[in-house]
């Protein structure tokens, strides 16, 4: 599927495991050419600092940062308040924690993708950019 090149958008990736951060960045670089990764953060503080420099169109957010599973939800709700147009896509390894997913969606996340076996695809990312809500690769309207 060819996505129009002029439909470019900027992404910040927030992920505290370096290997996963690199892997996710690679996926964007190779699979989603119209996305420009303008920054990556491994801590919440790094992320807020990045936002002062440049605002992305989408944040790819790991729910658990630095050992806290709830911090992603907090980041999400404060993004919703301060930047209502910014898309927030949650990328999480918290497979069995359904309460967390519900909290994330209630906090205004535009989508949740599980890290287990589900690769981030251009289609998913584009769906969220187009305003669909995505839970585990199934758009919900």
Where are these regions (language model features)?
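C-terminal output helix
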Residues: 99-100, 116-127, 138-139
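Two-component/phosphorelay signaling modules centered on CheY-like receiver
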Residues: 17-44
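Acidic, metal-coordinating helix/loop segments flanking the phosphotransfer/catalytic sites
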Residues: 25, 40-58, 65-68
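Short amphipathic alpha-helix used as the core "switch/output" element in two-component signaling
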Residues: 70-85
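Alpha4 helix (beta4-alpha4-beta5 surface) of REC/receiver domains from two-component response regulators
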Residues: 74, 95-112, 123
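Hydrophobic/aromatic residues positioned on beta-strands within the core alpha/beta folds
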Residues: 91-92, 115
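Two-component signal transduction core modules
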Residues: 59, 88, 112-113
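Non-catalytic signal-transmission and effector/linker regions of two-component phosphorelay proteins
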Residues: 1-12, 19, 129-130, 136-141
């Amino acid at each position: 599927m060819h996505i129009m090149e002029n439909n470019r958008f900027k992404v910040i990736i927030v992920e505290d495991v370096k290997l996963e951060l690199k892997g996710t960045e690679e996926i964007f670089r190779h699979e989603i050419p119209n996305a420009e990764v303008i920054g990556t953060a491994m801590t919440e503080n790094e992320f807020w600092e990045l936002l002062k420099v440049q605002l992305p169109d989408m944040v790819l957010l790991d729910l658990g940062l630095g050992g806290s599973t709830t911090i992603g939800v907090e980041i999400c709700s404060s993004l919703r308040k301060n930047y209502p147009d910014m898309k927030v896509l949650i990328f999480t390894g918290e497979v069995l924690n359904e309460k967390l997913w519900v909290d994330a969606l209630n906090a205004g996340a535009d989508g949740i993708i599980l890290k287990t076996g589900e690769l981030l695809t251009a289609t998913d990312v584009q769906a969220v950019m187009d305003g669909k809500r995505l839970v585990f690769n199934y758009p919900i309207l």
